[in-house]
């Protein structure tokens, strides 16, 4: 028996166009957006998808990918003093304490902890700049010419930028990593800090995880300069759709539109 898929993109595009006739499209509120089918990388919908914008904390998708590819989840990370007190969301790490890399990744991807992202950077890259070079090398390996990182957390920088399309491709690559998928699809996680003496519970900032069973991630972001940024992914019957919006004041609505559309996707057929 020969197995083949129906033309997923044709079906997705058709259903998407039908659904959004009665609901907002994912581009209504965003300056830049894209929806892609993960397996092929084909674009289903786009709006200024190749315009360079600040990614804010969606930067951390690449941070986690580089960390997982260059270290072990059971590695013990000694917190570098330079990571402590990093501006923005925080895990309130203390200099010298020892934390599992996996716990730092949960703090980064669920709690958006900037100090945890910095701690990972110092541990793996030796410095913020060194780790950013690793992130940029990984982006280059993916063929992404409109992405450049200055840091692992997404705080604003003059040469810290990406595009909706590039960010979708980064998420697409990251979702191939089983550890990454497990982390970003987790709703809440208790992690051990202060050398195991303190337990802190991180709740995923991605509210879509709590609304739809098919949502599998990925990451929220915000700075005053970048506005609201969001990368989400939904999966059903082996088809995964990734949605990215940048500078979107109504991102939850826009991503719900895509999720609703995805719930009506056809299954794979066998001939």
In which residue ranges do the predicted regions lie?
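Active-site-adjacent loops and short helices of periplasmic peptidoglycan-processing enzymes
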Residues: 21-165, 169-178
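Domain-terminus/edge residues, biased toward the C-terminal soluble/receptor-binding domains
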Residues: 144-145, 156-263
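Bacterial N-terminal signal peptides that target proteins for export
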Residues: 1-9
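Bacterial N-terminal signal peptides
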Residues: 9-17
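Single conserved hydrophobic/aromatic residue that forms the stacking wall/gate
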Residues: 262, 267-271
């Amino acid at each position: 028996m020969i197995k083949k898929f129906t033309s997923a993109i044709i079906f997705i595009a058709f259903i998407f166009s039908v659904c959004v006739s009665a609901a907002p499209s994912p581009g209504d509120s965003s300056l830049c957006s894209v929806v892609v089918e993960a397996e092929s990388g084909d674009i289903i919908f786009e709006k200024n998808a190749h315009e360079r914008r600040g990614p804010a904390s969606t930067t951390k998708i690449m941070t986690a990918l580089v960390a997982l590819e260059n270290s072990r989840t059971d590695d013990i990370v000694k917190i570098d003093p330079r990571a402590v007190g990093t501006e923005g969301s925080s895990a309130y790490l203390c200099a010298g304490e020892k934390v599992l890399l996996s716990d730092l990744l949960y703090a980064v991807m669920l709690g958006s902890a900037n100090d945890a992202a910095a701690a990972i950077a110092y541990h793996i890259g030796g410095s913020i700049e060194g780790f950013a070079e690793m992130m940029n090398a990984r982006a280059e390996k993916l063929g992404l010419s409109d992405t450049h990182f200055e840091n692992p957390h997404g705080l604003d920088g003059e040469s810290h930028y990406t595009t909706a399309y590039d960010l979708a491709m980064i998420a697409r690559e990251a979702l191939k990593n089983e550890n990454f998928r497990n982390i970003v699809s987790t709703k809440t996680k208790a992690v051990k800090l202060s050398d195991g003496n303190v337990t802190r519970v991180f709740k995923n900032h991605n509210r879509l995880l709590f609304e739809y069973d098919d949502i599998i991630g990925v990451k929220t972001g915000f700075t005053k300069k970048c506005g609201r940024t969001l990368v989400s992914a939904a999966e059903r019957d082996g088809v995964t759709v990734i949605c990215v919006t940048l500078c979107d004041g109504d991102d939850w609505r826009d991503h719900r539109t895509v999720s609703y559309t995805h719930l009506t996707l056809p299954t794979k057929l066998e001939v």
